[in-house]
Amino acid sequence: MIGLVNSAGTGVKITKYANVASMKSHGVEFTLSTKNIKTKDFDWNSDFIFSHAKNEVTDLHSNSRIIEMISGTGFTMAGYPVRSLFSIDFQGLNQYGQPTFINESGNLTVSDLNFQETIKKEHLVYEGPTDPTITGSFGNTFRYKGFNLNLFITYSFGNVVRLDPVFKNKYSDLTSMPREFKNRWTLPGDEQVTTIPVIADKLMNQQDSQLNYAYNAYNYSTARVAKGDFIRMKEISFGYDFPKKWIQPWKLNNLSLKLQATNLFLIYADKKLNGQDPEFFNTGGVASPVPKQFTLTLRVGL
């Protein structure tokens, strides 16, 4: 495993990349193909792929900062998966709607947090691996005379994702507000029914010059993690092969028409994602998904 380590100090760089860890991994994968029905006019075939993989870092020679361990890509410690996601322990909102946390000293705080800490990490909460442990697909092909229908589903389980880091102590008129803001703290007592912090006003920012730490910590806290599990309708295609007797007058060997739709929708995903796509995420959180694609194909054989 490649990572940053402190150099001897004789060169220009204080840190350098090196092999910093040892790890072990194991997994299994299998494919099952079946012919469910086969008659003169109708066929139904299925393909099922299942893959399970896990890994664990057994020895680590790198002191990562807290900010690296709580980012969306994940980091690691000995005894955990290679790409593990850790979070700051969110303890709910205070009476002013501000988020509170357990810091590196074990104290309850709003903004007394050190994201550059490399030693004290016991306060971090392990969420899970950012890489899925189970992946696979399930495809079904149906054929009736000249018609054919293909349904292809992909699935992934066992990982967690960091939600978009959209919360700030200050916003501008150009800021795009997330859906969660509908349920934010607005009145005293709301801290009993919501975990979405208040939109901090000017007075709050004046009273706490480090209030940005609180909202940044909220973005990387236990409140902003969702399961990465999903089942996706990856592809649906419908085609027709024209009969030979229809195309012979045109002196064609074959003629087919196919309509294909890709990346259609999620059959299942964590409701906490609020419409975000768990399959496409970046360092900060969940990224924009691949758009739906529709393709019409005409094949002509001369």
Listing of model-derived features with the role each one plays in the protein:
Residues 1-6, 43-47, 61-64, 149-156, ...:
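Composition- and surface-driven signal marking solvent-exposed, interaction-prone regions
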Residues 3-13, 61-71, 166-175, 270-281:
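Flexible, surface-exposed loop regions and adjacent strand-edge segments
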Residues 3-15, 112-122, 207-222, 273-280:
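Flexible, solvent-exposed coil segments and beta strand-coil junctions
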Residues 11, 21-25, 129-133, 226-233, ...:
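Transmembrane beta-barrel outer-membrane domains
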Residues 15-25, 70-94, 177, 189, ...:
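C-terminal beta-signal and terminal closure region of outer-membrane beta-barrel proteins
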Residues 18-24, 28, 35-130, 161, ...:
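Conserved small-residue
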Residues 26-36, 44-52, 136-142, 147-155, ...:
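Membrane-embedded beta-strands that build the outer-membrane beta-barrel scaffold
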Residues 158-251, 255, 274:
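Extracytoplasmic gating/loop element in the C-terminal half of outer-membrane beta-barrel translocons
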